[in-house]
Amino acid sequence: MAPPGSSAVFLLALTITASVQALTPTHYLTKQDVERLKASLDRPFTDLESAFYSIVGLSSLGVQVPDVKKACTFIKSNLDPSNVDSLFYAAQSSQVLSGCEISVSNETKELLLAAVSEDSPIAQIYHAVAALSGFGLPLASNEALGALTARLGKEETVLATVQALQTASHLSQQADLRNIVEEIEDLVARLDELGGVYLQFEEGLELTALFVAATYKLMDHVGTEPSMKEDQVIQLMNTIFSKKNFESLSEAFSVASAAAALSQNRYHVPVVVVPEGSTSDTQEQAILRLQVSNVLSQPLAQAAVKLEHAKSAATRATVLQKTPFSLVGNVFELNFKNVKLSSGYYDFSVRVEGDSRYIANTVELRVKISTEVGITNVDLSTVDKDQSIAPKTTRVTYPAKAKGTFIADSHQNFALFFQLVDVNTGAELTPHQTFVRLHNQKTGQEVVFVAEPDNKNVYKFELDTSERKIEFDSASGTYTLYLIIGDATLKNPILWNVADVVIKFPEEEAPSTVLSQSLFTPKQEIQHLFREPEKRPPTVVSNTFTALILSPLLLLFALWIRIGANVSNFTFAPSTVIFHLGHAAMLGLMYIYWTQLNMFQTLKYLAVLGTVTFLAGNRMLAQHAVKRTAH
């Protein structure tokens, strides 16, 4: 540990938390992400569609394809003048390639104009209108708008509506595009919110990105601010840039288009504020360095950064406010060394100004200022319980170990006193973790106590063997005393071997060896005690109940004897005999179930008896019916 009075060293650890004013971006394109996106778009052309995604996607990122002439030749050689989609890809691609002009015949022009019809799907109308616009051919915007509006009534999917927005951005500004613009609000209502951070269509990221790009392109075209809240824009941004690797060209193209729209439109430019360097950078001076950029990690040239206020996270006291950052290269810096902040956490509220388009431009930064802790006034004492002998006190200086041993027994207590100070400022410190650990040199047993400061911030630990015997299991011996100091804001956590302490407990309270030896011996067997069966009713009650149950049967026999039983139609055919025997067997099975069987056993037997009885009874009744018909 550096001695007191050494030069101050601050440790800045920075994290961004959500601003209370607005949602903070959690995803954006870092410089590495932008290069990865460019690599995803820079692929060999396989057809006109892939060429369109590569050429226009790279153009959105401000990059030309490596070989413009070769790309133009590929477009011309693969163009099908009789296909609207082919014409769309060629027109949009050639438009961003310098010096790539494609001549169009009258037949092709008529083909494109004919495709702008309410009988065509919206995708076809979009491709035709964009192709006419790309080739610089005249277009009746009102007629195209009428066809587009008519088709919107028939196609209500999210994709069709987004393509309608894309189409409208190619129409004349004099056309009444209000109905198309109103579709933006309807699309926003169809977005799904995830955890208050993300906003997307259930169709996925690609369509969400195309919606953002189409919305801002159309709003720039008509000169109207989009009907989206700032938080919704940030949620859409978080969704679009949450993915860093792309499986298809079309997905990479959609993300590039959305990134260009969010960084260059006339209404909303999300601000990305990133602390420079790692969150564990050590600085010789207390300097907060911030990189301020758009979603493409491009520096905002017009930005002006200002500290609104800095508050202690513990006390909420304001320690700094209304302080501008200075621009050094592309980094904004705030030097607050002169403020001499004590160690701890501080909440810095930073605002980016300079352009009315900036959104998410107020962020909260959690700044951790670390320091070094010093241990002073360390006293080790043995205090007589009867106070008949004056305390023996020994002062120790960190990191040395106290000479000799200290004794704590039934006659005297052991005490440790110390103070913790900030090495850089001399201020008193109260770290979160201040422990005293006693380690038995023979058995390895460890006992840990918390050291608490008093009202003067003097830490005290006192060991009374009569009160602490439970924690030690009354195990006497020589213990090594360690002092442990730790805190998230401390640069130098401390583990200090302070002294050796001999602790003696009364012999009769020594730890039981029987307990330790019996840990792995068989335990006494646990005998399960079943619940006593419930008392059965007296035999008289049971017999009376049985007689009542059988009384209807006795009555039946008595009536048969008196009026006679009609058995004239009884035959001794096999089906008749089997039916009656089966019926009797089922009644007998019920008795056996009552006395011996369980439900599942009974059901198996009953299934066999029931099947035989049913078949025999069915045969018996059929024979009886035939016999009655014959008579």
From Swiss-Prot:
Carbohydrate-modified residues: 106
Cytoplasmic-side segments: 562-571, 618-631
Biological process per Gene Ontology, one example term: protein N-linked glycosylation
Entry GO terms, CC: endoplasmic reticulum membrane; nuclear body; oligosaccharyltransferase complex; oligosaccharyltransferase complex A; oligosaccharyltransferase complex B
Keyword match NAD: no
Lumenal side: 23-540, 593-596
Residues annotated as transmembrane: 541-561, 572-592, 597-617
Disulfide bonds: none
One Pfam family of this chain: Ribophorin_II_2nd
Keyword Membrane set for record: yes
Signal peptide segment: 1-22
Record key words, sorted: Endoplasmic reticulum, Glycoprotein, Isopeptide bond, Membrane, Signal, Transmembrane, Transmembrane helix, Ubl conjugation
Membrane topology: Multi-pass membrane protein
Localization per Swiss-Prot or TrEMBL: Endoplasmic reticulum; Endoplasmic reticulum membrane
Pathway: Protein modification; protein glycosylation
Family: Belongs to the SWP1 family.
Subunit structure: Component of the oligosaccharyltransferase (OST) complex. OST exists in two different complex forms which contain common core subunits RPN1, RPN2, OST48, OST4, DAD1 and TMEM258, either STT3A or STT3B as catalytic subunits, and form-specific accessory subunits. STT3A complex assembly occurs through the formation of 3 subcomplexes. Subcomplex 1 contains RPN1 and TMEM258, subcomplex 2 contains the STT3A-specific subunits STT3A, DC2/OSTC, and KCP2 as well as the core subunit OST4, and subcomplex 3 contains RPN2, DAD1, and OST48.
Function recorded in the entry: Subunit of the oligosaccharyl transferase (OST) complex that catalyzes the initial transfer of a defined glycan (Glc(3)Man(9)GlcNAc(2) in eukaryotes) from the lipid carrier dolichol-pyrophosphate to an asparagine residue within an Asn-X-Ser/Thr consensus motif in nascent polypeptide chains, the first step in protein N-glycosylation. N-glycosylation occurs cotranslationally and the complex associates with the Sec61 complex at the channel-forming translocon complex that mediates protein translocation across the endoplasmic reticulum (ER). All subunits are required for a maximal enzyme activity.
Identification of the protein by name: Dolichyl-diphosphooligosaccharide--protein glycosyltransferase subunit 2
Lineage: Eukaryota, Metazoa, Chordata, Craniata, Vertebrata
Gene name, Swiss-Prot/TrEMBL: Rpn2
